[in-house]
Amino acid sequence: MRLFKQLERWKIRRQINQSIIDVIFRLRDRLAHYWQADVNTPQVDFMLLHIACSLGRIERGGCVSSLYSEMLEEMQSAVIFPQVLAIHQDLLKLMPFSIPEAEQTYFLANIHSLVLEQKQLKPLK
């Protein structure tokens, strides 16, 4: 499994720790079992690796700059954005600590790509 191997490499380099790996696999399970995502795709691996990097960075006191506002506005105006936001808010509940808004913009971008790629995701009610 590509995802697990990369997470283990980052753990050895002390970029992340075991608690972050545990969170990533909880997120993966939530995507698979609740949102009905196919979690065996490069897109999901990319998203989860990005989240792992972000959590490690936050634990070390760092934070990225926000996604370009034009890109964020384009995502927010998309017809799929309510579903993107619902998934985002659901996954945030599984995070071990507060995620800065700037980091969240990239989470939204990754989830946006996921929703575009996977039409079988659980629909909003």
UniProtKB/Swiss-Prot annotation:
Domain of life of the native organism: Bacteria
PROSITE patterns: PRD_2 (PS51372)
Xref: InterPro entries: PRD, PRD_sf
Residue span(s) of domain PRD: 15-121
Pfam families for this protein: PRD
GO biological process, one term: regulation of DNA-templated transcription
Name used for this protein in its record: Uncharacterized protein HI_0487
Protein source organism: Haemophilus influenzae (strain ATCC 51907 / DSM 11121 / KW20 / Rd)
